[in-house]
Regions:
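Flavin (primarily FAD) cofactor-binding/catalytic cores of flavoenzymes
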Residues: 1-45, 51-54, 93-258, 262-439
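Redox-cofactor-proximal catalytic regions of oxidoreductases
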Residues: 43-90
Length: 439
């Protein structure tokens, strides 16, 4: 009797759900199995956009080059081929290259279009259901997912592709501010900001850059101040790609954070002494991050989050040269000022640009609240997301690793650290497919 494939239900309508769908189909094809039935439950249609691409404005760029953005792990040039097929040209008329940083709206169209093609193929086994999942429970060896309208769907495996929660509330330094925007990615969040408003942007990361450039384009002459404790802006990608360094050489012993930091510092000094840029050193470590992070004990992970994470993030998650050119022009013109010492009374509106809260935080999702309450999932030791193994299989309160409940994306930040950029999302999607469809 031919082997069948399990049914899979993916909760979430962003790009990660499409990566999981594609990975499952590729895995089944590689094993000579029938394509699994995949159902994606999404609050917003079309599937594939999510907040990252569905709320992006036309000038918002990807933070990774086009060569890294393919949906398929087997066809790394897929996104570039798509751009060539559609005849895409940048604002300066140039064609896309491997090192191009493409607008996020364009990438969202690529992802959503790929999923729509699967929906349009009656033989694909892929379906989409619009709605909000509010609970996942075990029912007779399967998983039952209940939607807000009381619809119940069942599958053998559930993958949580929940995306990013809204930012946590920020009270300081907003005391005295006329009004606040708690979530800049909520629909219409920036519409109430006027050209004459004195705007405080809380945070100096990638979200701040998106919001600052958006407000400056909407309201030429607007005056903005960005604030954070250390005023660290994201670093900038090199003009041309440089091959990555080899990363860390294993000593055969369990890594500890002090030793890893010493070795990383040594490599940076070596690069500097040779007149080479630092970016390839960090890029060489990137493929090793999941294994290194999982090998660290809870104490070292917490130390990293407390003392290293912010500087790691601004160097790891870099902006394109064109984005830096626009941002630096705002700073040079006085449109945007950076200040660590601000008073709320000086501003008409404050925008929370601190980034998403933890997926494991209570109150933002009835689905997450229910899973935590039932012990089906637990927060990771650092409180950044859910505890899980390298394949995204979630750990329950009893300590066991689930064979039916997985996660991908921001939910795995505390388990794997680097989880939200496309290369890591694609990698975890492949691992999930390998677990769901073993050889």
């Amino acid at each position: 009797m031919p082997r069948s494939s399990p049914s899979v239900l993916v909760v979430g309508g962003g790009a990660a759900s499409v990566f999981v769908t594609v990975a499952l189909r590729e895995r089944a094809a590689a094993l000579g199995l029938p394509a699994p039935e995949v159902t994606v439950v999404a609050r917003d249609i079309p599937v594939g956009l999510g907040l990252a691409y569905g709320r992006a404005e036309a000038h918002h760029r990807l933070n990774s080059p086009a060569s890294a953005m393919s949906l398929s792990s087997a066809e790394q040039g897929g996104f570039l081929a798509h751009l060539d097929e559609m005849g895409w040209r940048d604002v300066d008329g140039s064609e896309a290259s491997a090192g191009s940083f493409i607008p996020r709206q364009v990438y969202g169209g690529y992802v959503a279009g790929a999923f729509q093609a699967l929906l349009d193929d009656p033989a694909s086994g892929v379906t989409a259901v619009q709605g909000e999942a509010v609970s996942v429970v075990d029912v007779g060896g399967r998983s039952a997912v209940t939607l807000a309208d009381a619809t119940e769907l069942q599958a053998d495996v559930v993958v949580l592709a929940l995306g990013n929660p809204p930012p946590g509330r920020v009270r300081v330094p907003t005391a005295g501010v006329g009004r606040t925007v708690d979530d800049p990615w909520a629909r219409g969040a920036l519409d109430g900001i006027r050209a004459t408003d004195r705007v405080l942007l809380i945070g100096t990361g990638l979200t701040t850059i998106d919001i600052a450039t958006s407000l400056a384009r909407r309201h030429p002459g607007v005056v903005m101040t960005a604030t954070s404790r250390h005023l660290l802006l994201p670093a900038v990608h090199l003009v041309a790609p440089v091959p990555a360094w080899p990363g860390f050489v294993s000593s055969g012993e369990a890594p500890r954070l002090p030793g890893l930091l010493r070795e990383f510092g040594r490599q940076l000094r070596t690069a500097s002494a040779a007149g080479e840029p630092w970016q390839p050193v960090l890029d060489g470590v990137r493929p090793q991050i999941h294994a290194l992070w999982q090998a660290l004990d809870a104490a070292d992970r917490k130390r990293f989050v407390a003392h290293v994470a912010r500087r790691w993030d601004v160097h790891r998650h870099r902006m394109a040269q064109s984005v830096w050119a626009e941002l630096s022009a705002l700073i040079d013109s006085g449109t945007l000022t950076l200040s660590a010492d601000v008073s709320g009374e000086e501003f008409d509106v404050a925008v929370n640009c601190t980034g998403p809260n933890s997926v494991a935080a209570p109150g933002w999702s009835p689905l997450v609240d229910g899973l935590l309450s039932a012990g089906a999932v637990v927060p990771d030791p650092a409180g950044l997301g859910f505890d899980a193994d390298a394949s995204g299989a979630l750990v329950g309160a009893a300590g066991g690793v689930s064979t039916r409940l997985f996660a991908i994306g921001a939910a795995l930040k505390g388990a794997l650290w680097e989880t939200v950029a496309v290369p890591e999302v694609r990698l975890v999607a492949t691992r999930i497919a390998e677990r769901v469809l073993p050889a």
